[in-house]
Amino acid sequence: QDSSSAASDVYKRQIVDLHAITIPYEPKELKQNTEQMAIDLLACGIDPEKSILFIQSLVPEHNELAWIFNCLTSYGELTRQTQFKDKSLTQDKQGKEGFISSGLFTYPVLQAADILIYRANYVPVGRDQTRHLELTRNIAERFNHRFGEYFPMPELKLTTIPKVMSTADPTAKMSKSLGEKHAIGLFEEEASMRKKIARAVTDSGDTPEGE
């Protein structure tokens, strides 16, 4: 998630490790992955002189604001977030301990806190995140109505490629959480990449969403 200020032109980029613990995980592996993510982002060109790169869990205000936002969000709104349904089904299919955490259900509220805590004006996301941003705007509007104008209404800024589809299932977004065969890693071996691309399910027509 990025936010920028016209005055300072500094981008805030966070590694969202709190979101990562909403599904079953190994603590040691999470720590290693978090550190590796920071290294990878810097290697990909993030400039520390122009960006603030930080780990989400090291800023406790994210959780504090998320709790306030939880109390401004209805159960019905969260049930309409399609990604919760999708991820829950994925975990069931993969047999991941048969445990669906409440954190997975409420993580869109934490996502709203991630955005609004920095009073972001624009949020660059894929098209699949539009419903989450709509929820974020609703939460900001309720907060402002109750406590006074404070949060700006963040605007959607779609990325150039709205959604990259899975190499194994053309109806799903590419995601490592679906399994190794569904995604191509940034530093994956060339032979493995070629194998996945060669086996990828393709179609001569439009994708399910015409993308």
Please report, for each region that a protein language model flagged, where it lies by residue.
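Active-site flanking residues adjacent to catalytic metal/cofactor-binding acidic residues
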Residues: 1, 14-16, 113, 127
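Single conserved hydrophobic/aromatic residue that forms the stacking wall/gate
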Residues: 1-7, 11
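Short, conserved active-site loops that position catalytic residues or coordinate cofactors/metal ions
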Residues: 12-24
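Glycine-rich loop at the start of a catalytic domain that most often binds anionic cofactors/ligands
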Residues: 21-39, 64-72
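A glycine-rich helix N-cap at a beta->alpha junction
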Residues: 33-53
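Short, glycine/charge-rich beta-strand/loop segments that flank catalytic centers
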Residues: 49-63, 82-92
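Acidic, His- and aromatic-enriched active-site or binding-groove loops in soluble protein domains
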Residues: 73-84
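Active-site cores that bind ATP or allylic diphosphates and position pyrophosphate for catalysis
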Residues: 85-211
